[in-house]
Amino acid sequence: MNYPNGKPYSKNKPLDGRKSSPFSSNIEYGGRGMTLEKDIEQSNTFYLKSGIAVIHKKPTPVQIVNVHYPKRSKAVINEAYFRTPSTTDYNGVYNGYYIDFEAKETKNKTSFPLNNIHAHQVEHMKNTYHQKGIVFLMIRFKSLDEVYLLPYSKFEKYWQRYINNIKKSITVEEIRKNGYHIPYQYQPRLNYLKAVDKLILDESEDRV
């Protein structure tokens, strides 16, 4: 069977030689050029409409520099700058749990550079984690088309290693070992809450 563009149909194959993740669906769709932010946005919309979770992207803080008032009842912003976010990208509620996470992409094939993370964001994640929030990083390796959930509890040691000038990145092998693979699928595109379910179970045992 051929598609309208003339290309033959073929079943999807695994991205690599890894065994199937317990969170995998039967179909892997891949990123297909979309950014991680768009994939998360689509997934969060699906969760909201399905009554599964309420998770939103936090607005980026803006510093207004110059405002013009052409009319007394109207203001026009002429100049403004995006400020460095003081917390993480996303937060919300899922099944009674507070969810808080940062999402990052990298073109690097072998590691995730930690200079992509700000110290005040890590401090926020630490404080939220100690209040029993579910805190993690979602990392996409663009060239590998792989997405992982890395819990804050696992990330913390790599951050300490970074600030102690021991190593400036987390290898993809370390992330695969300590994180949860999030496969692409149809709906939602990134069903990351299945990985969150596993994280909740694992951390409930660790925190006892």
Swiss-Prot record:
InterPro entries: Resolv_RecU, Restrct_endonuc-II-like, tRNA_endonuc-like_dom_sf. Residues 1-28 are annotated as: Disordered. Mg(2+) binds at residues 87, 89, 102, 121. The record marks 104 as: Transition state stabilizer. It is an enzyme of class 3 (hydrolase). SUPFAM superfamilies: Restriction endonuclease-like. It catalyses: Endonucleolytic cleavage at a junction such as a reciprocal single-stranded crossover between two homologous DNA duplexes (Holliday junction). Its EC number is 3.1.21.10. Its cofactor is Mg(2+). GO terms for molecular function: endonuclease activity; magnesium ion binding; nucleic acid binding. GO terms for biological process: chromosome segregation; DNA recombination; DNA repair. It is found in: Cytoplasm. Keywords: Cytoplasm, DNA damage, DNA recombination, DNA repair, Endonuclease, Hydrolase, Magnesium, Metal-binding, Nuclease. Binds 1 Mg(2+) ion per subunit. It comes from the Bacteria. HAMAP family: RecU. Endonuclease that resolves Holliday junction intermediates in genetic recombination. Cleaves mobile four-strand junctions by introducing symmetrical nicks in paired strands. Promotes annealing of linear ssDNA with homologous dsDNA. Required for DNA repair, homologous recombination and chromosome segregation. This is Holliday junction resolvase RecU. It comes from Staphylococcus epidermidis (strain ATCC 35984 / DSM 28319 / BCRC 17069 / CCUG 31568 / BM 3577 / RP62A). The lineage of its organism: Bacteria, Bacillati, Bacillota, Bacilli, Bacillales. The gene is recU.
